């Protein structure tokens, strides 16, 4: 059994939607990023990579590489899962916490879970996503960006 933790942050910038967990969510801002800015999938990818001691997404998908400009984070997550499987592991479960004052995540959580489960090749009950605010404290509370913590439990395949 292996455990990994991931954390990622993206700041808000120009745009009228964000993508989290592969779900496009209307918002008054977009997220600034080299890829599509899916901070949830980035944190989850880091948790998975960490659990098998393969570094982080910056190592595998550097923001200095134009190949990954605007990249679909779901495709990146699927690649990460192929690396996890290549090391002889399968997902036991994953759990993520989105930290954001806005937009409201509750209406989108189920769709996020479904997409993540599909990309990981696991059952829905192996994926949990939840959201919280910081009661208007800190950079997320001031609506300057979004942060996500994720953990992954891997088992021998």
Curated annotation (Swiss-Prot):
Q: Name one GO molecular function term.
A: 2-C-methyl-D-erythritol 2,4-cyclodiphosphate synthase activity
What is one GO biological process annotated to this record?
terpenoid biosynthetic process
Q: Name one Pfam family in it.
A: YgbB
Q: Does the keyword Lyase apply?
A: yes
Domain of life, per UniProt, equals Bacteria
Matching InterPro entries = MECDP_synthase, MECDP_synthase_CS, MECDP_synthase_sf
What does the record say about how the cofactor binds?
Answer: Binds 1 divalent metal cation per subunit.
Q: What is this protein called?
A: 2-C-methyl-D-erythritol 2,4-cyclodiphosphate synthase
